[in-house]
């Protein structure tokens, strides 16, 4: 699978965010690295079809995406299992094992509002990894995670990248040294 962007442009209020960006994304992790406010989230939103570019072309992005946004977008009154059922329609096989790898318990009946930010972040990642998809868009997926939980998440993200494009927007490239990096410009 290949996703290609050619001459991509996007501005907000007359201020350019992306100016003529071109890249090709294939299976594996590609890190999108840049200071805050320089287009990482914008690029992901364009690829996901949540926004339209001002110019340029996006080819191959009309596939099934799974995403982790900067906000976890969980239903706070539901348990982990309830959140997964709501988002995915049912509990996929392997959900319990995947959550266990992330240090979470699928059978925990507590609503996620009682969980820490890091636990919610890991559940959001699990939801994306369990969703049927051709590509993953991960926007700052390590926010709120300690070193041990970041390592757990990284292992699963690397595995996912063996079969599909994974676009990972981050400020911190620790553990991602072997991934290609698309650096967006400073403002």
Residue ranges and their predicted role:
Residues 3, 17-20:
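Conserved structural motif at the start of ABC-family nucleotide-binding domains
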Residues 111, 140-141:
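Walker B catalytic motif
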Residues 98-116:
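Conserved ABC nucleotide-binding domain
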Residues 139, 146:
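ABC-family nucleotide-binding domains
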Residues 125:
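Hydrophobic anchor residue at the start of the ABC signature
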Residues 71, 78-90, 94:
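Q-loop/switch helix immediately C-terminal to the Walker
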Residues 48:
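Helix-to-loop junction immediately C-terminal to a conserved catalytic motif
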């Amino acid at each position: 699978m290949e996703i290609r962007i050619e001459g991509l442009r996007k501005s907000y209020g007359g201020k350019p965010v992306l100016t003529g960006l071109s890249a090709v994304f294939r299976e594996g992790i590609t890190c999108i690295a840049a200071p805050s406010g320089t287009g990482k989230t914008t690029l992901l939103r364009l690829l996901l079809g949540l926004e339209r570019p001002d110019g340029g072309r996006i080819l191959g992005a009309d596939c099934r995406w799974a995403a982790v946004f900067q906000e976890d977008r969980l239903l706070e009154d539901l348990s982990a299992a309830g959140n997964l059922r709501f988002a995915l329609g049912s509990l996929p096989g392997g959900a319990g094992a995947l959550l266990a790898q992330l240090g979470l318990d699928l059978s925990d009946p507590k609503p996620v509002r009682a969980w820490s930010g890091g636990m919610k972040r890991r559940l959001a990642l699990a939801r994306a990894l369990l969703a049927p998809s051709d590509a993953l868009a991960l926007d700052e997926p390590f926010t709120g995670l300690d070193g041990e939980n970041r390592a757990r998440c990284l292992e699963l993200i690397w595995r996912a990248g063996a079969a599909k494009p994974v676009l990972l927007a981050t400020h911190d490239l620790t553990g991602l040294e072997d991934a290609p990096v698309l650096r967006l410009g400073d403002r």
